[in-house]
């Protein structure tokens, strides 16, 4: 096999490859609608919005009111932003870069 991945690691890699193969927003909607429950999709969207707000310097109280998410979840997201692998920050910066192309000129 040569890749060094076994069992669940290979399964996870294959799922990430499936996500990376999606080319349009419609494909994403269709894939995630089949893969996840409405609640799971909503939870992911809330976490991403909370991460954006944390990166923008918003307080926990502001985030709770705007996103209707628990302070425990906000705290976990904040720990990921501060000490994690950088996934939230990198993804949010990429999305913001595509939404505001003038900033890159």
Feature locations, PLM:
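Short, amphipathic alpha-helical "recognition" segments used to contact nucleic acids or chromatin
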Residues: 44-58
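Short, charge-rich, low-complexity alpha-helical interaction segments
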Residues: 15-22
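Single conserved hydrophobic/aromatic residue that forms the stacking wall/gate
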Residues: 1-7, 11-12
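Intrinsically disordered, low-complexity basic tails/linkers immediately adjacent to helix-turn-helix/homeobox/MYB/SANT
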Residues: 91-105
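Short helix-capping/linker segments at secondary-structure and domain boundaries
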Residues: 57-64, 86
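C-terminal structural segments of small proteins and small subunits
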Residues: 71-94
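Short alpha-helical "recognition helix" segments of helix-turn-helix
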Residues: 62-67, 74
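Short, Lys/Arg-enriched anionic-surface-contact patches
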Residues: 26-46
